[in-house]
């Protein structure tokens, strides 16, 4: 299992660097290793990573399918952390793909944030707040966007998560 997570984590990182083809191959390799080993535990996380890779490359339809797979697996395996991540990504993808479904996107992101807060997973619930602010910004709701982004910025600063703090600040500059 550590090898599969290493492959998927590497792919996720490659996606942030803009190398989406390598990213997808690496995450898919991680998924294959995990499936071949017959281990379902943490498999949803691999699909969340693959979803993020597809999202970052602009393939929102594939991102949605992978997130739905992650959500289904996380619920069937009772993996609450992955379920929270899946809801956040599902909402982010929905909001970007269909701005008219902003309410549904908001609901999904908030559901994911709530799950992650219940698990005391502050870095990831804060990421959900960033994505919610991004969703509001993309639908022209500047006040709601700023409220969520300011909260996320403070939390990222407190946790020393400079990359995400800086991304949050860039979004705030757009308001």
Question: Where does each model-flagged region fall?
Answer:
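Helix-coil-helix junctions within alpha-helical repeat/solenoid scaffolds
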Residues: 1-175
């Amino acid at each position: 299992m550590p090898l599969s997570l290493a492959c998927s984590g590497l792919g996720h990182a490659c996606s942030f660097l803009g190398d989406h083809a390598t990213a997808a191959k690496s995450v898919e390799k991680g998924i294959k290793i995990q499936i071949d080993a017959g281990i379902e535990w943490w498999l949803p996380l691999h699909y969340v990573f693959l979803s993020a890779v597809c999202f970052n490359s602009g393939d929102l339809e594939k991102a949605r399918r992978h997130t739905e797979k992650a959500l289904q697996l996380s619920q069937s395996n009772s993996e609450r952390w992955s379920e929270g991540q899946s809801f956040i990504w599902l909402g982010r993808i929905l909001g970007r793909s269909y701005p008219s479904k902003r309410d549904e996107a908001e609901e999904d992101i908030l559901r994911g944030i709530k799950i992650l807060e219940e698990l005391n997973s502050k870095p990831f619930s804060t990421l959900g707040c960033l994505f919610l602010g991004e969703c509001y910004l993309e639908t022209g709701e500047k006040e709601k966007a700023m409220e969520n982004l300011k909260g996320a910025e403070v939390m990222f600063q407190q946790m020393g998560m400079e990359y995400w703090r800086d991304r949050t600040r860039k979004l705030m500059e757009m308001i």
